[in-house]
Design a protein with these regions (language model features):
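Short amphipathic, basic-aromatic surface patches that mediate peripheral association
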Residues: 28-38, 163-178
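Surface-exposed loop/edge segments in extracytoplasmic proteins
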Residues: 52-60, 191-200, 235-236
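Short acidic/polar inter-strand loop motif in beta-rich domains
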Residues: 97-118, 229-238
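Short, compositionally biased P/S/T/A/G/V-rich stretches that sit at domain boundaries
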Residues: 125-170, 248-249
Length: 249
């Protein structure tokens, strides 16, 4: 009887120790050379899963503001200083785990601009009851938002336009924090998957607008692959626009 009693006590203690503890993790998305990604570009889908089994433990949306421009872009942060505040975009994940687990934090978006979709992920150990709050886990997402379109005029003139921004929606302007002269913007003209021309798109302002033109006389269907490239960071954004050169009547 005495032995049985202590076996029961041990089992109860083991059961208590195995009870899952709810743990909170703040997850955020940050654009390259820019600010946080959130509501202004349609939000970012966040998925928290076990890195070994793929079990999804929580998922939701990163929404909120892009953060304080002065803190993020103008004044160098000192060690330990927060990058975020209560308005900065983030997703507060809640996971129930009963032992330390290696989790994967996966981001997909921005959902307001399908052509700019990116996916990024990072893994981190999480210990039951040990929250990861404040700035939380910040994941950098590459890319720009590039929205391109074309217009075909008489004589085979093709006008190419694009409106571009940082992935967080931050503006590209002539004299602002993200200056148009720092980016290469071009359109690669393709037909049947072959490059036939390359057109430089010049900044026309006031915010994020670029345009260029070319002339194509051969009737057929074409594709303009428009890209914006930052040589300093290696960051790239792309969009595509189809157009047709009609046969002469």
């Amino acid at each position: 009887m005495y032995t049985r009693f202590w076996i029961i006590v041990a089992l109860m203690m083991f059961s208590l120790s195995a009870i899952a503890a709810e743990t909170q993790i703040m997850v955020r998305a940050k654009a390259v050379d820019s600010k946080f990604i959130g509501t202004s570009v349609g939000g970012i889908r966040a998925i928290v899963e076990d890195a070994e089994t793929g079990e999804i433990l929580d998922q939701g949306w990163i929404n909120g503001g892009t953060g304080d421009t002065a803190v993020l872009m103008e004044n160098p942060l000192k060690r330990g200083e927060p990058q975020t505040d209560e308005k900065t975009a983030g997703f507060l994940a809640n996971v129930d785990i009963d032992a330390p687990r290696l989790l994967r934090f996966k981001l997909i978006g921005p959902y307001g601009y399908q052509q700019a979709y990116q996916e990024a992920s990072v893994t981190s150990w999480v210990v039951p009851g040990k929250d990861i709050l404040g700035d939380g886990i910040i994941i950098t997402m590459t890319g720009f938002i590039v929205d391109a379109w074309t217009r075909v005029l008489e004589g085979g003139q093709v006008d190419i336009y694009t409106k571009a921004s940082l992935l967080c929606g931050c503006p590209i302007t002539k004299d602002g924090l993200w200056q148009a002269d720092n980016y290469e913007v071009k359109a690669i003209i393709m037909r049947d998957d072959k490059n036939i021309d390359e057109v430089t798109l010049d900044f026309t302002g006031p915010i994020g607008m670029f345009s260029g033109k070319t002339t194509i006389t051969e009737p057929g269907h074409y594709k303009a692959v428009v890209y914006l490239y930052d040589a300093k960071t290696g960051n790239v954004g792309v969009d595509r626009s189809m157009f047709e050169i009609p046969k002469a009547l």
